[in-house]
């Protein structure tokens, strides 16, 4: 794959992650992780929740005055279940925090980190050459910092790609926003 397309795809993927949102991707990835690993803690949490709800439902049906012993036993059971659920929730939150750190690191490496590496690795290689005389004395800026004169450097190409992708996003948002406004006005 050519350097030109590789850089464009890297910039596009980075912007796509930005558009979707890292937290949305984190939640999707964590849900998938829980399904694939079949986490025992998550299964226990679900079972404990349903057990607490069933016990609480029975507790609400029991009269505290007429059947005090049964009511007290159910109340202790609900309280114990809630305490166990709190402990389990803190364990799951700790696990999710660890997963979040790893996931965010992976996203950064796969988007921004790869762009830095590609920019550094190909810093002296031109992405493409410009026809002579098109930009006159400003052609050196397009080759900045290390590409040969008369060419476009990786850094400049990354900036141009990002600008085009962000502009494309704005155009799509404006077009969909106007069409949605039209639907709301006409109905």
From Swiss-Prot:
Lumenal side: 1-3, 129-151
Transmembrane spans: 4-23, 108-128, 152-168
BP GO terms, sorted: tail-anchored membrane protein insertion into ER membrane
Coiled coil: 72-94
Cytoplasmic side: 24-107, 169-187
Membrane topology: Multi-pass membrane protein
Cellular localisation: Endoplasmic reticulum membrane
GO terms assigned for molecular function: protein-membrane adaptor activity
UniProt KW keywords: Coiled coil, Endoplasmic reticulum, Membrane, Transmembrane, Transmembrane helix, Transport
A GO CC term assigned to this protein in UniProt: endoplasmic reticulum membrane
Source superkingdom: Eukaryota
HAMAP family (alphabetical): Get1 (MF_03113)
Family: Belongs to the WRB/GET1 family.
Function text: Required for the post-translational delivery of tail-anchored (TA) proteins to the endoplasmic reticulum. Acts as a membrane receptor for soluble GET3, which recognizes and selectively binds the transmembrane domain of TA proteins in the cytosol.
Subunit composition and interactions: Interacts with GET3.
Name under which the protein is recorded: Protein GET1
Source organism of the structure: Laccaria bicolor (strain S238N-H82 / ATCC MYA-4686) (Bicoloured deceiver)
